[in-house]
A protein has these predicted regions:
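Conserved subregion of the PPM/PP2C metallophosphatase catalytic domain
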Residues: 1-166
Length: 166
């Protein structure tokens, strides 16, 4: 229903059910199919953002400070989990000139660099804190990750989403 679209944890629960039905997880008791996700719902009238994450965190940059809002430690899909999901929601007052980022663990877990270690969250947050424009931030993270990865194989999906509110 439309009411549910303003509640990100409900959207994630609906997505979880859709994944289970589409992949027939209950029917085959398959446990290795699923995904991590995050959902933002924004009210311009109230300058309020609601966020719910399934193993995905939200990062908000305002005035060169990056703040982390943690998602819950549960993924969507996968048959071995509670039903319905017990997901929390963050209610965040926002101000103009804020930028928002969500990224997958495929980025942070990518092996590379001179020591062949994981890329890490710290590198991403450093780039986010240095840039003022979302487009430039995403471009810089993409280029830095590509350079860091070198000849190492990609381990997972690489998902990076950013937006701003002016």
């Amino acid at each position: 229903s439309l009411e549910d679209l303003s509640q990100p944890e409900r959207i994630l629960n609906q997505l979880d059910e859709l994944l289970e039905d589409t992949l027939k997880l209950k029917e085959y008791d398959v446990t290795n199919f699923g995904m991590d996700a995050g959902v933002c719902c924004f009210s311009r009238k109230k300058n309020l953002l609601l966020y719910s994450g399934a193993k995905m965190n939200l990062y908000i940059k305002h005035d060169n400070i990056v703040q982390e809002y943690k998602g819950d430690k549960i993924s969507l899909g996968y048959s071995q989990k509670p039903h319905p999901l017990q997901l929390s929601s963050h209610q965040i007052n926002i101000s103009n000139n804020s930028s928002f980022y969500i990224f997958s663990d495929g980025i942070t877990d990518q092996i590379g660099g001179p020591k062949n270690i994981m890329y890490g969250k710290k590198r991403i947050l450093n780039i986010i804190s240095k840039n003022s424009k979302v487009e430039k931030t995403i471009f810089d993270i993409s280029k830095d990750l590509e350079s860091y990865q070198q000849n190492n194989k990609r381990r997972d999906d690489l998902s990076l989403f950013g937006f701003s509110i002016a």
